[in-house]
A protein has these predicted regions:
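A short, well-ordered alpha-helix in the C-terminal region of glycosyltransferases
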Residues: 310, 317, 324-338, 347-350
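Conserved donor-binding/catalytic core segment of Leloir-type glycosyltransferases
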Residues: 4, 178-195, 201-204
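Nucleotide-activated donor-binding/catalytic signature segment of Leloir-type glycosyltransferases, i.e.
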Residues: 229-245
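Acidic anion/phosphate-binding donor-loop and adjacent secondary structure
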Residues: 64-68, 147-152, 157-182, 192
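Short hydrophobic beta-strand element within catalytic cores of glycosyltransferases
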Residues: 282-285, 295
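Aromatic "clamp/platform" in nucleotide-sugar-dependent glycosyltransferases that forms part
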Residues: 246, 265
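Short His-centered aromatic/hydrophobic patch
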Residues: 87-94, 111
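Conserved acidic donor-binding segment of nucleotide-sugar-dependent glycosyltransferases
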Residues: 297-309, 317-322
Length: 356
C-alpha cells in the first residue's frame, strides 16, 4: 500500500511524534510511506524518519492561507500516487482538497484532541465539509474523543473508527527498582496553556515546603516557557524546579525519574503518558479527554485536579509511599502493551483497507 502522511510541521510534540511512529511502523511492515510537512523545518523527527527509510518532503508553506501550497501538494500527490492520504491537525484542509482533486479515494484525518479544542471554529466548518461532503474519515484516539467528534460534527459514532496512539515499545527502559522515597518528578510537554504549567509549578512549590528533597524537571519548549521561567524565579524555586529544554531521548529522561506528572486541562491521548506507562513510572494526571480511557484511578495512575492544592496533595502522597508507586507503575506498564506502534499501525491498516 502507498500511504501519504500530511502534517503541518514535525515539531517535537504529541501529534507529530505519533505521525513519525506510525510512518516508521508502516514502513517496517513493507508499505511505501511518504511524509509531507507543510512548513519547512528540520527536527529530530525528520531526521529519525529519514534514518528509518521514510522520506520527508517540505512544501515551504507561508504563514496564513497559502494557495500555492494546495498546488504543490497536488503535484506531490500526483507524483507519489498514494492509495491513502492521511492528515493530522490542521493539514486536513490542504491535504484532502488536494487529494480529492487528484482522485485519491481513501482520505483519513486523525483528530488528535477533544474536537472542541482540536480546531478553530473556522476550521471546524471546513472539517464538517470534509467529513460530510468529501468522504474524509475522522479517526478518534479514544471513546471519549469519539464522543466529542459526534458532539461537534454531528456524525454517527459508527462513522468514526478508533485507533489508539502507539509508541515503539522496544525503545523503552522499564523501571527495574522503585526507590524508598520519590524525589525526582518529571513533566514532558509543550509550554502552552493546556499543559497547566503555572498550577503545576505552584503546586510543586507547596509540596516542596513539606518535602524539601523533591525536584521537578520540565522537558519541552513552547510559547509560555519564558513566562514559566519567570514564575519559578519569582517563587525562588530555581534550586528544585529545572527547565531541561527539548530532548530526543525521552525514554532515558524518564528512566532517571521516580514519578511522571501531567496535570493538563484537556488532552486527547498524550504520547508522553504512553511513554511513561511503558517505562513503568507511577503517574499523576488529570482525568480529562482520552486519559480516562487509558488509565484507571488508583490502579494505573493517581488522578488529580488541575488546581495547585490538588497537585500538591498528589505529589506529596507519592513521596514516601513506595508500595503505591510500584503498584501504579507496574500496572500501568502492563496496560501500556495495548499502545504499541505495531498495534496502532495494524489498526490504521484496517481503516485504510476498508476504504479501498
Amino acid at each position: 500500500m502507498r500511504i501519504l502522511q500530511v502534517i503541518p510541521v514535525l515539531d517535537m510534540a504529541g501529534a507529530e511524534t505519533m505521525c513519525q511512529n506510525l510512518s516508521v511502523e508502516l514502513h517496517k511492515m513493507g508499505h511505501d510511506v511518504l511524509v509531507i510537512s507543510l512548513y519547512t523545518k528540520e527536527t529530530p523527527l525528520t531526521e529519525n524518519l529519514r534514518k528509518n527509510g521514510v522520506p520527508v518532503v517540505f512544501l515551504e508553506k507561508k504563514t496564513g492561507l497559502d494557495i500555492l501550497c494546495f498546488y504543490r501538494l497536488y503535484r506531490e500527490i500526483q507524483k507519489f500516487q498514494p492509495d491513502v492520504v492521511h492528515s493530522h491537525i490542521y493539514a486536513g484542509k490542504y491535504a484532502h482538497i488536494a487529494a480529492s482533486a487528484a482522485g485519491v479515494k481513501v482520505k483519513i484525518y486523525t483528530v488528535h484532541n477533544i474536537a472542541q479544542k482540536e480546531a478553530t471554529s473556522s476550521d471546524q466548518k471546513i472539517n464538517r465539509f470534509l467529513f460530510r461532503r468529501m468522504g474524509v474519515v475522522p479517526v478518534a484516539l479514544s471513546e471519549e474523543v469519539r464522543q466529542t467528534i459526534v458532539d461537534v460534527y454531528h456524525l454517527d459514532s459508527k462513522e468514526i473508527p478508533i485507533a489508539c496512539n502507539g509508541i515503539p515499545m522496544e525503545r523503552c527502559e522499564p523501571c527495574s527498582a522503585y526507590s524508598k522515597t520519590a524525589t525526582n518528578y518529571i513533566h514532558v510537554g509543550r509550554f502552552c496553556e493546556v499543559k497547566n504549567h503555572a498550577n503545576l509549578i505552584h503546586g510543586f512549590v507547596k509540596a516542596h515546603e513539606q518535602y524539601p528533597a523533591i525536584q521537578l524537571r520540565l522537558y519541552g519548549d513552547g510559547p509560555l516557557r519564558q513566562k514559566m521561567e519567570n514564575l519559578v524565579a519569582e517563587l525562588q524555586a530555581q534550586d528544585f524546579i529545572h527547565f531541561m529544554g527539548l530532548t530526543d531521548d525521552v525514554y532515558s529522561a524518564m528512566a532517571k525519574a521516580d514519578v511522571f506528572i501531567l496535570p493538563s486541562i484537556y488532552e486527547g491521548m498524550p504520547m508522553t503518558l504512553i511513554e511513561a506507562m511503558a517505562t513503568g513510572l507511577p503517574i499523576i494526571t488529570t482525568p480529562v479527554g482520552g486519559i480516562v480511557d487509558m488509565l484507571e484511578d488508583g490502579k494505573e495512575a493517581a488522578f488529580t485536579g488541575t488546581d495547585p492544592d490538588s497537585i500538591a496533595g498528589s505529589v506529596s502522597m507519592l513521596v514516601d509511599n513506595a508500595a503505591l508507586r510500584q503498584s501504579l507503575g507496574q500496572t500501568a506498564r502492563i496496560k501500556a502493551k495495548q499502545f504499541s506502534a505495531e498495534t496502532m499501525a495494524k489498526k490504521y491498516l484496517e481503516i485504510y483497507s476498508e476504504g479501498i
